[in-house]
Structure formats: structure tokens, C-alpha cells
């Protein structure tokens, strides 16, 4: 089974929690999965993995976090063309609309989304945990 990198940025810890659950799901499906905060992941590590879960919460006016995550995403996007990817993140208000332009951008860049992006309001509850694990399983088995 191919290796999965779960890479996230989290301000409150909610998206970090989601990242850990996504990795649990990938591991339960038989994949090797590693979790990284965006600041701890080097672009050079991309070649070590075949599948990627990218997590970022909604920030400001329903957009990706722009000081660390957005620059990272823009830098790695060309290398992820044709790769299997899952998108996830948390939000505190609004309806999670930031995920729609992110999904469209990822698809336009050639990322192969294995499932609908997962947006969870605040911290994941038991249903949110299960949804994160299901996303990880989908990524591992797609």
C-alpha cells in the first residue's frame, strides 16, 4: 500500500485533531500514514509519498490561512498534479464556503480528489471523527 502524508495548518487545534483522525483512517485501511504540520513538512519530502491529505481551517473572509498554508499549497500544487489528494479543514462560523474555491482550484491544478472535501464546524465530535477516518480510508484505498 502506498504511503500517505497528512499535512495541515491549525490555529486552534481543531484541524490538527482532524489530521490525526484522517491518518487513523488511512492506517486502518492498511496504509502507512505520517502527520505533519505544514511548517514541519519539506517540499523535498513529497517524493516519499504517493497520496496526500491537505488540511487547513477557514480563516478571515472564508479563505485559506495565508501566511503558512497558502504559500505551501501554491508551492507544492504543481507537484501534486495527477496525485490522489483529500482536502479537509474546520471552520468556526459561516457554512464552510472556503472549501468550494479550494476544491475548484485543486481540480483545476490537476489534483485527483478521492472524495468530497470534508469541512467540520469547530472540533470534530464522534460523527466528525468517523468522517475524518472515512476520508483517510478513502484516500488509502482510492
Positions of predicted regions on the chain:
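Aromatic-flanked redox-active Cys/Sec active sites in thiol-based oxidoreductases
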Residues: 8-12
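FMN-binding flavodoxin-like domain, especially the glycine-rich phosphate-binding loop
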Residues: 2-3, 14-17, 21-38, 48-142
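Helix-turn-helix
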Residues: 41
Amino acid at each position: 500500500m502506498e504511503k500517505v502524508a497528512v499535512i495541515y495548518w491549525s490555529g486552534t487545534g481543531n484541524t490538527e485533531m482532524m489530521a490525526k483522525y484522517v491518518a487513523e483512517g488511512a492506517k486502518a485501511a492498511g496504509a502507512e500514514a505520517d502527520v505533519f504540520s505544514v511548517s514541519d513538512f519539506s517540499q523535498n519530502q513529497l517524493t516519499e509519498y504517493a497520496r496526500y491529505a491537505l488540511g487547513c481551517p477557514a480563516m478571515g473572509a472564508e479563505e485559506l490561512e495565508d501566511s503558512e498554508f497558502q504559500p505551501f499549497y501554491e508551492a507544492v500544487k504543481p507537484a501534486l498534479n495527477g496525485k490522489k489528494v483529500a482536502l479537509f479543514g474546520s471552520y468556526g462560523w459561516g457554512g464552510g464556503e472556503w472549501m468550494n474555491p479550494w476544491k475548484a482550484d485543486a481540480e483545476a491544478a490537476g489534483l485527483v480528489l478521492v472524495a468530497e472535501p470534508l469541512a467540520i464546524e469547530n472540533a470534530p465530535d464522534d460523527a466528525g471523527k468517523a468522517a475524518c477516518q472515512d476520508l483517510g480510508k478513502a484516500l488509502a484505498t482510492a
